[in-house]
Structures are given as C-alpha cells and as structure tokens.
C-alpha cells in the first residue's frame, strides 16, 4: 500500500543513520541523552556529570550504537553478544537459570537494551 504516510516514513528513514560508538564525544553524548531521558521520566536522580553510565556499558561483549536523524543523536541501542566465554548481560543476570545452561550447551545470544 503506497500511502502518503508510507512515503513520508521512507523519506524520513533516508536521513536515519546508525553508528557504532567506541568512545570519545559520541559516547559522552549517549550518556547525556540517557541521563536526560531518565531524569525526565524519574528513573534516576541528579548526577553532577549530567551523564548516566551503567556497569553494562563497557563490558568486552557490549556494542553501543547511536541513532542519528539529520545528524542529531535521537536514540541509542546497546547489544551484548552473549557466549559461554562472555556471559555478561542484563538478561543473564535476570534469568541465569534459563540462560546459563543454554550457554553451556554452546548457544549464543544477542541481548538488546535501550
């Protein structure tokens, strides 16, 4: 179905870019965006740095992406590639009884957050 809404969405997507963030100013921008979002929703209190970083951000199996629209950071995604060698992720902490046996059998997972 070729509607005006579909065309508008497709045109907008032409201006959306996903970037792997490995550090520096882009990483700080992610932490600031997250902090501002969490503050507005009441999920965290004031932090002097104006940035929210958690223990999952810098693990060896963590990959952070910035979502940019018209070159403006608008969202973030974080993935953990979970293996038996690197079983670190929010989901493994939340559901170890389910995931650890599967990892021990050689299964691997992608755990996506924010």
Summary of predicted features, one role per range:
Residues 4-57, 62-69, 73:
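Short amphipathic alpha-helix that is part of the acyltransferase structural core
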Residues 77-114:
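Conserved acyl-donor/pantetheine-binding loop and adjacent beta-alpha core of acyl/acetyltransferases
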